[in-house]
Amino acid sequence: MFKKLFLLAVLAAFAFGAEAKVSLYELLSTPNNKSLLKRLGRENILSSKSEPGTQAIFFMSAKSKPELFYVLEFYKDEAAYKKHLSSAHFKKFASASAEILASKKAISLKKRAAFSKNLTPEHLKDAYFHITNLSLLAKSDAKFEKIIKKYMQKSVDEGAYAQFAFSQKDAPNKWVLVEIYKDEASFESYRH
């Protein structure tokens, strides 16, 4: 299943260590509350800039379904993630957004591949995100990881800022690929 996404806000440049904590959330806003959810998300992200260990937070909405939002978070480690969860600004976001969400799904991820070039807040202002969810055949994840790493490493350039591959921690055969492009035209040029 493909979801074409655009960037709402970005936090900071980051590097991924072995202990990095990555989370993905799917948030479905109730009717007429998309703007409020965007505002709450932006406030939470901007308030998170000064948190040590918070590396990046991407807040995106689906082009095909504007009330569907994704939050992709990168933390130095589990301790940094827990510190973010206990912050006043996150508690405010969680409390206020709970009243306007039709659903919320948390997906715990394991990093499999991460390649980036020119991934800075300035470059990401008009960036285009593409998320792909895959279900692999049983016991094929190691082979797929090798293939996807080679492909992603070659794909990162001036038009493709980043390529990430994750597997779900509770279902290793379910993968999430996140691609960040300069703009939608760059994404379309890579598809052909």
Where are these regions (language model features)?
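Sec-dependent N-terminal signal peptides
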Residues: 4-14
